[in-house]
Curated annotation (Swiss-Prot), chain A:
NCBIfam families (alphabetical): PRK01059.1-4
Keywords, sorted A to Z: Allosteric enzyme, ATP-binding, Kinase, Nucleotide-binding, Transferase
Catalytic activity: L-arginyl-[protein] + ATP = N(omega)-phospho-L-arginyl-[protein] + ADP + H(+)
Annotated binding of ATP, by residue: 27-31, 93, 127, 178-182, 209-214
One Gene Ontology term, aspect cellular component: extracellular space
InterPro entries (alphabetical): Arg_Kinase (IPR023660), ATP-guanido_PTrfase (IPR000749), ATP-guanido_PTrfase_AS (IPR022415), ATP-guanido_PTrfase_cat (IPR022414), Gln_synth/guanido_kin_cat_dom (IPR014746)
Enzyme Commission number: 2.7.14.1
Phosphagen kinase C-terminal domain ranges (all copies): 24-256
Summary of the function given for this chain in its UniProt record: Catalyzes the specific phosphorylation of arginine residues in proteins.
Protein name in UniProt: Protein-arginine kinase
Keyword Transferase: yes
Regulation: Appears to be allosterically activated by the binding of pArg-containing polypeptides to the pArg-binding pocket localized in the C-terminal domain of McsB.
């Protein structure tokens, strides 16, 4: 699949609800921050040097041995993409919103299934990302590690014995590793246990964010939990810590779901079917309402209240109903009101196509 | 003083916010204050990580988080970034900054990470002595285990390997 096809398709490999613990854990991600020795960091990098970094990365990803190890990687400059296509890459979590500024300095490397992506000249020269469905942090780390080793064959990294990999922001030095899991925690929210859980996580040196990163709200009961500390621990220790915590959260969420299902069966069934009904028949739908209803519907799928709906459809519909994606499908810019109508139409069509299958 | 927001009722709540040396003050009546607080986070915008870090670095250089006059101007010889710039953005200009300006930030790293020594991955080709140091660390762990389980022959061979590597480092 080419990059042009990637942005036309709402489906990403990491949306498949096939990974381990997928009833609670939507996806796992590992990110490695790396910089090239001898160049200023991106926020003070001139155009000429930015170009040199892009070329260096382009030749590093083109190495035969790397491609043999991890598959076909290709660099695209941000300027080769339209502004809607760039926005879609953000909505699909393949690049960060910061990449939309100064596109002439930046580029993105993608494997065609979107599992591997590398941002070039974002906050650091390289941000190697691996994204997989369910709880697969170890697998993500192994893959990112292999890509990192491959790039290091050609690229001289900025590295110091004591401080490890040097990054533009001191919160990332050392391993440069940020690992995160995206969790769907509707029952912990409904039973009002979530605040206690979040407080505990912050005591364990973990950060919690909403679906679209720093500062975003946890709409749709989706939470991203990631490590805060990157220096002084090994990569394996960081990954193991996060896996342990993620499994704890899975246990707690499942217990809360069982309790809800047992004690408030009618309320839960009502909530789930109302959500399904609205998604299937409503004529306008805001983005926030969509997230809330999809969360309720997914809970219904996981509890077995609704059958015949693949769990992956929920994330697919979330991506599908983001503003840039809607514009792309429609082939025109939409105002917020038109978007709400078109969003409802697309969701309706997708859900009705499932019941006909 | 009237409330900044409704301009009708007297201001009773005085809210001061200092981010990155810039000071913002809001004077609100109790009704507006509770509405703003309940309504959104807009009242106290969420501090982004860089602003927060910039504040910490600034505090570290100057000993005060609200001092606004000139900062000591240590400058990175490689990229020309000054302490003031680093303190303002929370970002270093280049990898050399870590050895130039960074020396003074070392205690801060410890405060952020709880440690200031990297124990993780080392680049294979360019890691140099760091790679050897890492191998020694791993071997020392293995040595401890071998002693614990009374595998003395194994322990002796690990010890020899450590000695060999330590000589390389000298």
């Amino acid at each position: 699949m080419s990059l042009k096809e990637t942005v036309s398709n709402p489906y990403s490999k990491w949306l498949e609800a096939t990974g381990p613990e997928n009833d609670v854990i939507i996806s796992s991600r590992v990110r490695l921050a790396r910089n090239l020795m001898g160049y200023p960091f991106p926020h003070v990098l001139g155009h000429e040097n930015a170009d040199k970094v892009l070329y260096a990365v382009q030749s590093a990803v083109a190495q035969k041995s790397l491609q043999e190890a991890v598959g076909n990687l290709e660099l695209s400059r941000m300027t080769e993409l339209s502004s809607i296509e760039r926005q879609i890459l953000v909505e699909k979590h393949l690049i960060s919103p910061d990449m939309l500024e100064q596109p002439e300095k930046r580029g993105v490397v993608l494997r065609d299934d979107e599992v591997i992506s590398i941002m070039v000249n974002e906050e650091d020269h390289l941000r190697i990302q691996c994204l997989l469905p369910g709880l697969q942090l170890k697998e993500c780390w192994d893959l990112a590690n292999t890509v990192d080793d491959g790039l290091e064959q050609i690229i001289d990294y900025a590295f110091a014995k004591e401080q490890g990999y040097l990054t533009s922001c001191p919160t990332n030095i050392g391993t440069g590793l940020r690992a995160s899991v995206m969790l769907h925690l509707p029952a912990l929210v409904m039973t009002r246990q979530i605040n206690a859980v979040l407080t505990t996580l912050s005591k364990l040196g973990l950060t919690v964010r909403g679906l679209y990163g720093e500062g975003t709200q946890a709409t749709g009961n989706l939470f991203q939990v990631s490590n805060q500390v990157t220096l002084g621990l090994t990569e394996e220790e960081i990954i193991d810590n996060l896996i342990t915590v993620a499994l704890q959260l899975v246990t707690q969420e499942r217990a809360a779901r069982r309790a809800l299902h047992k004690e408030q069966l009618h309320q839960i069934e009502d909530k789930v079917w109302r959500a399904y009904g609205l998604l299937k028949y409503a004529r306008t739908m805001t983005s926030n309402e969509t997230m809330t209803l999809l969360s309720d519907m997914r809970l219904g799928v996981d509890l077995g209240v609704i059958t015949g709906i693949p769990p992956g459809i929920i994330m697919e519909l979330i991506i599908l109903s983001r503003p840039a994606f809607l514009s792309k499908v429609k082939g025109a810019d939409l105002n917020p009101y038109q978007r709400d109508i078109f969003r409802a139409t697309l969701i309706r069509e997708r859900l009705n196509s499932l019941s006909n299958e | 003083m009237l409330c900044d927001r409704c301009q009708k009722r007297p201001a009773e709540v005085h809210f001061t916010q200092i981010i990155n040396n810039s000071k913002k003050q809001m004077n609100l009546c109790s009704t507006c204050a509770s509405e703003l607080q309940a309504g959104s986070l807009g009242f106290a915008p969420q501090l982004n990580l860089h602003d927060f870090l910039a504040g910490l670095i600034n505090h570290h250089f100057t000993g005060s988080s609200i001092q606004t006059n000139a900062l000591p101007q240590m400058r990175c010889e490689k990229c020309g970034s000054t302490e003031a710039q680093v303190a303002k953005t929370g970002l270093f200009g280049c990898s050399e900054c870590y050895s130039q300006i960074g020396e003074r930030v070392r205690p801060l790293l410890k405060r952020i990470h709880g440690s200031s020594i990297h124990t993780g991955k080392v680049p294979k080709r360019t890691g140099g002595t760091a790679l050897i140091a890492k191998e020694i660390r791993i071997l020392k762990n293995q040595l401890q285990n071998a002693i614990k389980y009374e595998e003395f022959e194994e322990a002796a061979s690990i010890r020899d390997r450590i000695k060999e590597l330590e000589q390389k480092l000298q």
